[in-house]
């Protein structure tokens, strides 16, 4: 991790501790869902990207100072995990250089599947240890207590380092935390949707509960499905490349977010950064060290842009201004 720490000196943010574990991560990681194309249930939803391009994206993230990667069983039934492994090896990174997080898919399963599924995760990650293993969502045939006990068994067996959840409500997160506490382990994270365009966790108790319990929030979709980049505001014709569902969703969002995106552009001009970088910086800054985030990337410049969001600091006034403009979301 020394190389990463040296790179972090060029950034404006320190490494953050994942919950109450000893795992140190950059405030921005790289989400790997876009690497799912070609496999499993989610495969058809994403274009197939060549391994060469995936290698370049991961290398760009690493060179920008990012030290952790978030993948999942659901992301192509191992395609994303295996692609990440190949990319890390191509970049010359060892297990000690990076932090890898992945997830167990619980739908139509019980906690008894957890010790079996982990063997596939280990196989696909091929030598890169699982620093964080999460229950991907709350729908399951088992209780959170049963799931956490199965996860704790994996920690005891040395197969994972820490346990997290994703898309859990405040109450379900509290139950997971309590179950792990009985095993002498912390609940490290709750991975949920959060951005300037979706601040529901501030209103439904999830963020307050996470802060109370010392659980890190991992924010996914931090750019509002691309709306906060401003590209759809400048060129609405880009929507024609999207499905009917996405066009319907993004079209309404374009009008509602116009004022917010204009402010992101104005602030970005001050720092010579993009609206997306301002939006990411706000996510990792507004609540102190409570929230980290995982924007995805399919192109080198996107990974570079995400890493570059850690190279400047928004002022308190700018954070408050963006808070005010997005408070209705």
Model-predicted segments: where are they?
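Conserved beta-strand positions in the central sheet of alpha/beta enzyme cores
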Residues: 29, 68-70, 131-134, 164, ...
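Beta/alpha (TIM)-barrel catalytic core signal, keyed to glycine-rich beta->alpha loops juxtaposed to Asp/Glu
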Residues: 3, 12-15, 138-329
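A short, structured active-site edge motif that brings together acidic residues
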Residues: 95-108, 132-136, 191-194
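N-terminal binding-site loop/beta-alpha segment at the start of enzyme catalytic domains
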Residues: 2-98, 156
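Active-site mouth loops of central-metabolism enzymes
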Residues: 38-51, 103-112, 136-142
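Short, acidic/polar
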Residues: 47-61, 110-125, 144, 148, ...
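Acidic (Asp/Glu)-rich catalytic clusters
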Residues: 85-95, 119-127, 153-155, 177-182
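Active-site groove signature of glycoside hydrolases
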Residues: 125-143
């Amino acid at each position: 991790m020394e190389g990463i720490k040296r790179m972090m000196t060029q950034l404006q943010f320190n490494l953050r501790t994942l919950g109450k574990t000893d795992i140190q991560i950059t405030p921005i990681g790289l989400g790997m869902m876009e690497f799912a194309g070609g496999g499993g249930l989610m495969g058809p939803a994403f274009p197939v990207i060549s391994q060469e391009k995936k290698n370049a994206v991961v290398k760009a993230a690493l060179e920008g100072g990012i030290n952790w990667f978030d993948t999942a069983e659901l992301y192509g039934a191992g395609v994303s995990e295996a692609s990440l492994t190949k990319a890390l090896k191509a970049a010359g990174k060892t297990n000690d250089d990076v932090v890898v997080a992945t997830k167990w898919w619980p739908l139509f399963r019980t906690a008894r599947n957890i010790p079996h599924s982990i063997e596939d995760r280990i196989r696909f990650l091929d030598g890169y240890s699982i620093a964080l293993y999460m229950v991907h969502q709350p729908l399951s045939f088992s209780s959170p207590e049963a799931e956490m006990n199965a996860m704790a068994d994996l920690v005891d067996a040395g197969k994972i380092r820490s346990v997290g959840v994703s898309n859990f409500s405040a109450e379900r997160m509290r139950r997971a935390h309590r179950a792990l506490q009985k095993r002498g382990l912390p609940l490290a994270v709750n991975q949920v949707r959060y951005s300037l365009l979706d601040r529901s966790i501030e209103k439904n108790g999830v963020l307050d509960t996470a802060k109370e319990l010392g659980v890190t929030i991992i924010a996914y979709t931090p750019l509002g499905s691309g709306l906060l980049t401003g590209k759809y505001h400048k060129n609405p014709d880009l929507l024609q490349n999207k499905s009917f569902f996405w066009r319907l969703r993004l079209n309404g969002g374009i009008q509602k977010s116009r004022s917010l995106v204009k402010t992101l552009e104005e602030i970005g001009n001050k720092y010579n950064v993009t609206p997306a970088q301002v939006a990411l910086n706000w996510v990792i800054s507004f609540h102190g060290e409570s929230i980290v985030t995982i924007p995805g990337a399919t192109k080198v410049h996107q990974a570079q842009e995400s890493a570059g969001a850690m190279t400047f600091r928004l002022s308190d006034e700018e954070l408050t201004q963006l808070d005010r403009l997005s408070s209705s979301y």
